Amino acid sequence: MKVAVTGTPGVGKTAACALVRSLPVRNVNDLAVEFGAVKGYDRRRRTKEVDVRRLARAVARLEGDMIIEGHFSHSLGVDLAIVLRCSPRVLAKRLEAKGWSAGKVRENVEAEAVDVILVEAVEGVPEVCEIDTTRRTPLGMARAIDAICRGEREKYPVGNVDWSREVLSWF
């Protein structure tokens, strides 16, 4: 089984996956480099441009169960997507603390507020769970990921995270 741990940048994917014990973890950016799927660099966004189709073909050839961690890992033909979610207000603070530009913070907070990655995962992955990371420690997130990978998915259904009240309070 290939499992994506995905979510908007800043929700805690990398910190959580560093503590996961149920399956080996591969980082989506490392896989892109390993399989020659990096096609350029977006200077404005300060990020690698990845040929997702090429990377998905390479991931399909990988053997064994694994977690693929990264904000577009749900686009790689995985069996299960675990979407990590975070309050847009908290996410903004996290990204600002990382020194991200105001534009990049806004872009990612808006994406989280309107469920961009969750919708993509639901549309393209056979099974999806979501975890609210707002008040969880990395260890707490890792334990939830491990539980989901062991089949304990009923606590983490799609739709259990809703930022609509928070978003409406912005107006």
Predicted regions and their residues:
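NTP-dependent small-molecule kinase module
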Residues: 123-171
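P-loop (Walker A) phosphate-binding loop of NTP-binding proteins
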Residues: 8
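Short, well-ordered beta-strand core segments
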Residues: 66, 81-83, 128-130
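A glycine- and Lys/Arg-enriched "phosphate-lid" helix/loop adjacent to the NTP-binding pocket
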Residues: 39-40, 86-129, 135
